[in-house]
Design a protein with these regions (language model features):
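Bacterial N-terminal signal peptides that target proteins for export
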Residues: 1-9
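Autoinhibitory N-terminal propeptides
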Residues: 18-22
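C-terminal PAP-associated
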Residues: 23-457
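Bacterial N-terminal signal peptides
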Residues: 8-17
């Protein structure tokens, strides 16, 4: 069934299509990216990951990295790179962090800031990495983009967006046109404009010269927030956003067919957002839809609380975003919580990952054993495989303390992510299996790490 009308999710959960496992052959070893490179054993959250389209053995990742706390600093964009398909990693911080007296650090426009947040990165077709985020200290939440060249090997500079023009930003997401068309190489950045003088909401900026200059901000859905973005194989730009009205919101899709110069926006679904903390738990949760696309269509996943627990929902469009399929549930059990879903598409395979509590939840809802699960589709989302456990050990998400301006609330970030290349998927997540190996005053548990694994099919 297809329609542009909004669907109530709770009425559709039973419509999930699940087939036997498709092409999954092996979930590889869980790799602790920061195990031996963070002597302070601090937290890393909100991970992001991308595979180099020129060389699938090269993978880059990022996260909010709290290692500077041990020397009086704060959270900062970590940058991690692998040249052996994710087996081993080099670890660094984006230049400009507090105490960075290198020439790159002193020349970075980030050098005046105390901390950064909301990391998301992507590759273009030429081996350039674009890494976005926001500052999180005076004078406000300022948007920035970092560029790495040489397949992510070389730092090439940082652009800071003037807050007087681009306002206070939140939750940026980034995508690059790799279509080979007239806008190939264009970089698109969506974010929440939270303090605009005019219409607030989902906003887009773009660059057509490799990040040297950027367009003025364009409001594409006033009142929208928590954007996701993808560029399809024909260069069309899709931006998802949610309306206000927590917990009952609507999802909107904004579409550009002219390289991001103009957008049309329409409402596609009703959504019940996750509560700010799941019942019985103290770490925070959000509903943040994520997008992917390939030659078969455009796909969206999100976490929905319409049945009184969190479920991973999926829909697709095969007509350039005009109509969307009835949402289906991806998690193949209804018990427990299933949240922080992420999606990627490559080589005819759709890959989805999420956090899942099916193996470790008390009767009051408290999660004691969290895992990462994976599902795939080889028929453009018409059905999904049996869910597959990715994590080799369960962990407690209510342990690690959030080292954030004196806030000691357990914190798992607001998202995890998956990247894909032909024949493989690469999830990345925040993991507490080694947390609380020791504690520090005020901030409690340490050693919350980034993990990844390679799933081959």
């Amino acid at each position: 069934m297809r329609s542009r009308l909004a669907f109530p999710i709770f009425a559709l959960v039973l419509m999930m299509a699940v087939l036997p496992a498709h092409a999954v052959t092996k979930v590889g070893k869980n790799i602790d990216i920061t195990a031996s490179n963070d002597p302070a054993e601090r937290q890393q959250v909100e991970p992001t990951i991308a595979v180099d389209p020129r060389n699938q053995n090269i993978i880059v990742a990022g996260a909010q990295d709290y290692r500077l706390l041990s020397i009086g600093g704060h959270r900062w964009h970590g940058f991690y790179r692998s040249t052996d398909d994710g087996l081993t990693w080099t670890v660094s911080l984006v230049p400009g962090f507090p105490g960075d007296n290198s020439s790159q650090g002193l020349s970075s426009p980030l050098h005046a800031f105390q901390c950064t947040s909301d990391p998301v990165l992507t590759f273009d077709r030429n081996g350039n990495v674009y890494y976005t985020g926001i500052t999180c200290s005076t004078p406000g939440f300022t948007l920035f983009v970092v560029k790495y060249t040489g397949d992510g090997a070389t730092y090439a500079g940082t652009t800071l967006f003037p807050i007087s023009t681009y306002h206070h930003a939140d939750k940026p997401w980034i995508a690059v046109d790799t279509s080979g068309g007239q806008n190939d190489g264009a970089v698109y950045l969506s974010y929440d404009d939270v303090f605009a003088q005019g219409p607030q909401g989902a906003t887009l900026v773009s660059s057509r010269d490799g990040g040297q200059t950027w367009s003025l901000p364009m409001a594409i859905n006033p009142g929208g927030f928590d954007t996701g973005i993808t560029v399809d194989q024909n260069g069309r730009v899709f931006v998802s956003s949610l309306s206000s009205g927590f917990p009952h919101a609507s999802m909107f899709m904004s579409i550009s067919i002219d390289g991001g110069h103009t957008f049309t926006t329409h409402r596609i679904f009703d959504v019940t957002e996750l509560p700010r903390s799941l019942p019985g738990n103290s770490f925070r949760t959000f509903t943040i839809p994520q997008l992917a696309s390939d030659s078969n269509g455009v796909y969206v996943v999100w976490d929905d609380y319409g049945l009184g627990n969190s479920n991973v929902m999926f829909s697709k469009s095969t007509d350039r975003g005009n109509t969307w399929t009835t949402p289906t549930r991806v998690n193949d059990v209804i018990t427990g919580q299933h949240f922080f879903s992420s999606i990627a598409a490559s080589g005819g395979v759709i890959s989805i990952v999420w956090y899942d509590s099916r193996f470790g939840q008390l009767s009051n809802g408290t999660i004691t054993g969290l895992n990462v699960f994976y599902a795939q589709s080889t028929n453009a989302g018409s059905s999904f495989s049996k869910n597959i456990r990715v994590t080799s050990a369960s962990f407690n998400p209510n342990l690690a303390e959030r080292a954030d301006f004196g806030n000691t609330q357990p914190f798992m970030g607001d998202y995890i992510q998956v990247a894909a290349s032909p024949g493989a998927a690469h999830p990345i997540w925040t993991d507490n299996r080694d947390a609380c190996s020791n504690t520090v005053p005020i901030f409690g548990c340490t050693n919350q790490d980034l993990f990844t694994a390679t799933i081959r099919f």
